[in-house]
Amino acid sequence: MTVTLERRESTSLWERFCSWITSTENRLYIGWFGVLMIPCLLTATTVFIIAFIAAPPVDIDGIREPVSGSLLYGNNIITGAVVPTSNAIGLHLYPIWEAASLDEWLYNGGPYQLVVLHFLLGVAAYMGREWELSYRLGMRPWICVAFSAPVAAATAVFLIYPIGQGSFSDGMPLGISGTFNFMLVFQAEHNILMHPFHMAGVAGVFGGALFSAMHGSLVTSSLIRETTENESPNYGYKLGQEEETYNIVAAHGYFGRLIFQYASFNNSRALHFFLGLWPVVGIWLTSIGISTMAFNLNGLNFNQSIVDSQGRVINTWADIINRANLGIEVMHERNAHNFPLDLADNSLLPVASSSPSINS
């Protein structure tokens, strides 16, 4: 018997590191995008938790009226938030070393900018990591394309909108009630409910939820039973099996009779592509809408669009919405010297035909 011994080529530490980073045998795939994602998301998460619990009030409007957002300063889980960076900072990058002290950095809302920028980098890297793992496994790249929709939405509200409005103070606060406040103010200032792209996003999200529920219930109701009546049908499924796990013909026939013939898919690939496409395109369109409204290309305006023969306005729902928008905008302005543009831009109404003479 002949035994051949070959000298094992020595690999450098860097090569072993590269092999470990890109290995698909790890329990959790890291990848080169993961090298960026992990520190960014850890930083964003850590600072968010600390700021949500203990950050001091922030002068969000830059008018020396700090707003409290943390739990230790009187808030609860519902009202708490990481308050956006001060309007006094605007769009300037505001790392800790740009402030004169840590107290100043906290007062001006530095944690918000730190969390948002690291979070956006992290989720973008997560999307790239999805593509990277798909590539290494020989899969198609549609998973990261689908995830691009929430990435686009987050980028729109946390980065594009502040850029368009000229200050990070206009970004969405990182909290529950802060999110609702952002939505109300956005409606008041941009009439988003009357924007076609927002309507498409609503159809995408709610339609996607409806289609998902319909698909899941149809599949669950048409499983191919491989077990006896006394056992769960789930025991008849083996991970990775080549056979179909449900009868798409039965599901197609059921749904075709429930609605009409052409309302159902008879091709599983086309069906699942549609299920992925519908909500993704809707959220893409909403993100584009937010990004255009960031630069004040607002929703449609049908205010006072109907008048009678005497020129009197006949109010429609558009006028009701406009009245609500004005009320929200007035309540939003905490600084009494800052009137909403809708109220401040009206032409002056004369109160006298001529000025009275004043005897000196």
From Swiss-Prot:
PSII is composed of 1 copy each of membrane proteins PsbA, PsbB, PsbC, PsbD, PsbE, PsbF, PsbH, PsbI, PsbJ, PsbK, PsbL, PsbM, PsbT, PsbY, PsbZ, Psb30/Ycf12, at least 3 peripheral proteins of the oxygen-evolving complex and a large number of cofactors. It forms dimeric complexes. It is found in: Plastid, Chloroplast thylakoid membrane. Chlorophyll a PD1 binds at H198. This is Photosystem II protein D1. 2 of the reaction center chlorophylls (ChlD1 and ChlD2) are entirely coordinated by water. Its EC number is 1.10.3.9. A quinone binds at H215, S264, F265. It catalyses: 2 a plastoquinone + 4 hnu + 2 H2O = 2 a plastoquinol + O2. The record marks H190 as: Stabilizes free radical intermediate. PROSITE patterns: REACTION_CENTER. Keywords: Calcium, Chlorophyll, Chloroplast, Chromophore, Electron transport, Herbicide resistance, Iron, Magnesium, Manganese, Membrane, Metal-binding, Oxidoreductase, Photosynthesis, Photosystem II, Plastid, Thylakoid, Transmembrane, Transmembrane helix, Transport. Tyr-161 forms a radical intermediate that is referred to as redox-active TyrZ, YZ or Y-Z. Pheophytin a binds at Y126. The keyword Mitochondrion does not apply. Chlorophyll a ChlzD1 binds at H118.
